[in-house]
A protein has these predicted regions:
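Long, charge-patterned amphipathic alpha-helical coiled-coil/hairpin "stalk" segments used as oligomerization
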Residues: 55-131
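N-terminal, charge-rich interaction modules
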Residues: 1-58
Length: 131
């Protein structure tokens, strides 16, 4: 068992939301909620599965942001975690309540623009976000 710090990679001007959910349909539901709440929003979303092949599911409206979210999700590698990269000019305050109200979303760890490190706990059987 060990701890690891994973730095979130992103341009300085971008905001992101890091959270935890419990169902593979999370990606589709977050995507639909965002485009409904903020028409024209630019975002990339990635979700780490926690069982089976432990795939990373992704979606979004901007290919570069989708790839950035996927890269960060792969680095974090914690089951049931998701990362939502918001395009320049879009802020968590505009979508945070929408995301929190999605039934699959269990919680939000953070929603900053600041440089961020995520503390990961690895048991050898899986990884989890400590904070």
């Amino acid at each position: 068992m060990e701890f690891e710090s994973v730095s979130i990679k992103k341009p300085e001007e971008l905001n992101f939301i890091l959270g935890q959910a419990h169902f593979i349909k999370t990606v589709e539901d977050i995507h639909e909620a965002l485009v409904t709440a903020v028409p024209g929003i630019k975002f990339g979303l990635a979700f780490c599965e926690a069982s089976g092949a432990c795939l990373i599911r992704s979606s979004g409206t901007d290919e570069a942001l989708i790839q950035l979210a996927r890269e960060n999700a792969m680095n974090i590698g914690a089951g049931h975690s998701f990362i939502l990269m918001l395009g320049e000019g879009y802020f968590p305050i505009n979508v945070l309540n929408t995301v929190k109200n999605i039934p699959e979303v269990c919680g939000i760890f953070c929603a900053p623009a600041n440089p961020t490190g995520v503390i990961i706990y690895d048991t050898g059987r899986g990884r989890g976000i400590m904070g």
